[in-house]
């Protein structure tokens, strides 16, 4: 799933969007979910219940409210102009309150929902920091790739999906090789190599223009995905290398939560910057859109757009 998801996801999502509608990107998860649940019920052995272990419902509820409100604020913040909207302010207050009660309760109860002893392990704490960096930087960049390919480069939805899938192909190749490479190289060497590849490809993307070749995009995406594969497996291995067995369940869930929240924060930041940049550039260009601009008096412009009418100005805008 980790390897095939990044390959099949963009291609399948693009095909469903182009053939049916974007709603089917979500509907398609229903049959896969049913198959997964059925497989768990049929093939997975039942584990023994630990009756002496109580579930921390208060900590779970407080954390769910904190994370849920934060995610909602991050998703809707750009649409509602962030702190100018009372909805975003209320969501952030609810999120802060949820996190406050979660931490206050966790430090005072005997069996908290999350064992904070996991952060005392240096390898795990370091891996967590790297996960935050990857979530903020890489996944936010991936979120901008699809609108870049479609809006700026003019590729159809299906072509954009196939281009995004090449990154997953690079990750697939790296994960097939990394287990054998770990027999010859240290985990930190592979992680450093993977981060270097990702940094190089991201830097190369800053020089892309509207006429960038498809071959360049494919090579860049494959190398970037290969770098991610070199980082992901050794980083996960290093995170749990010295973590006690009874803390590994908490560690696994914490890595997943932190990566998802970090990616949401990163995506919100880049979308906010994109929106502000678009607004600023639009304002500069709009200053030159008037009937007295000589460039707009050319026959190929005046034949299709009349700037003296509201419809013409709206079309130009």
Regions found by a protein language model. Give the residues of each.
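Hydrophobic alpha-helical segments of secondary membrane carriers
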Residues: 1, 130, 254-258
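Hydrophobic transmembrane architecture of multi-pass small-molecule transporters
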Residues: 35, 258-317
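Residue-level hotspots within transmembrane alpha-helices of multi-pass secondary transporters
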Residues: 7, 11, 68, 176-177, ...
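Helix-loop-helix hairpins in multi-pass membrane proteins, especially solute transporters
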Residues: 1-59, 169
């Amino acid at each position: 799933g980790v390897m095939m998801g990044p390959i099949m996801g963009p291609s399948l999502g693009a095909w469903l969007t182009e053939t049916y509608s974007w709603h089917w990107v979500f509907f398609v998860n229903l049959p896969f979910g049913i198959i997964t649940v059925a497989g768990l019920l049929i093939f997975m052995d039942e584990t023994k219940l630990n009756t002496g272990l109580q579930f921390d419902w208060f900590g779970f509820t407080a954390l769910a409210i904190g994370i849920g409100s934060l995610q909602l604020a991050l998703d809707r913040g750009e649409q509602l102009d962030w702190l100018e909207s009372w909805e975003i302010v209320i969501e952030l207050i609810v999120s802060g309150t949820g996190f406050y009660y979660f931490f206050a309760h966790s430090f005072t109860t005997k069996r908290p929902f999350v064992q904070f002893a996991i952060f005392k392990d240096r390898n795990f704490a370091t891996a967590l920091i790297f996960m935050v960096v990857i979530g903020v930087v890489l996944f936010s960049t991936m979120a901008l790739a699809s609108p870049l390919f479609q809006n700026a480069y003019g590729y159809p939805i299906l072509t954009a999906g196939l281009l995004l899938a090449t990154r997953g192909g690079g990750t697939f190749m790296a994960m097939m090789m990394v287990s054998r490479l770990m027999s010859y190289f240290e985990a930190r060497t592979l992680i450093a190599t993977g981060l270097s590849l990702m940094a190089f490809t991201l830097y190369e993307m800053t020089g892309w223009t509207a006429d960038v070749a498809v071959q360049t995009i494919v090579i860049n995406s494959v190398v970037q995905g290969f770098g991610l594969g070199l980082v992901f497996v050794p980083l996960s291995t290093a995170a749990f290398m010295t973590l006690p067995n009874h803390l590994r369940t908490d560690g696994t869930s914490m890595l997943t939560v932190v990566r998802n929240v970090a990616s949401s924060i990163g995506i919100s930041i880049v979308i906010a910057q994109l929106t502000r940049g678009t607004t600023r550039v639009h304002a500069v260009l709009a200053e030159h859109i008037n009937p007295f601009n000589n460039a707009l008096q050319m026959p190929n412009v005046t034949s299709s757009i009349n700037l003296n009418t509201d419809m013409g100005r709206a079309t130009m805008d």
